[in-house]
Amino acid sequence: VESRGLGDVYKRQIAYLSRKARKMLDDAGFEDCTIVASNSLDEYLIRDMISQGAKVDSFGVGERLITASSSPVLGGVYKLCAVEKDGKICPRIKISDNVAKITTPCFKRPWRLFDRETGKAIADLVTLNNEVIDDTKPYEIFDPDFTWKRKIVENYVAKPLTVQLFKEGECVYKFPPLDEVKKYCAEQIDTLWDEVLRFDNPHNYLSLIHI
């Protein structure tokens, strides 16, 4: 079922037309024939089709996935966090009137905290690169923008989120096969709470700084 060039009216009829097509195919003895819907689909359109009883076996998702249409621009900028002087690392900070542009000095390391009982992700946080989180002890974290928002985390597991890819210009990382990458991504999504994953009014996932 392809909506290319036929406008939004046709696109809104995909659920209905897929049901009609399924019946026609089945009546003709082509029960094993699959129906694919494509063209500018995203998770919201796919959800609507499914809720409308669309008889679609697979969805072709193209530009909406490739370009991340809801957030097409990543506002990322490299900022100096430290310099080496006389063999020592000296932290550096950028000062700005805009709080969001003030950097955290020195080399850093991201972590993810998981609830030990449920396995669900609690929060992501940033520490200095040489720090190690002792997850046998309570841990206090706070929001970097609203620093009065603090939380004591207990009964958790702390896992670092980065691995070394290059060392002195040489690749030291063995890239896993795509099947393993896919499996890992699915497992990580399963660690998120349903309230974070829902389409409408999702809870904000916590990204914090440790104390």
Where are these regions (language model features)?
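Residues that form or flank phosphate/diphosphate-binding pockets in enzymes
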Residues: 1, 16, 44
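Single conserved hydrophobic/aromatic residue that forms the stacking wall/gate
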Residues: 1-6, 10, 209-210
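Gly/Ser/Thr/Ala-enriched C-terminal appendages of enzymes
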Residues: 12, 23-28, 33, 41-209
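Active-site-adjacent beta->alpha loops and helix N-cap segments on the catalytic face
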Residues: 13-19
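Small/polar loops that bind or transfer phosphate-bearing groups
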Residues: 37
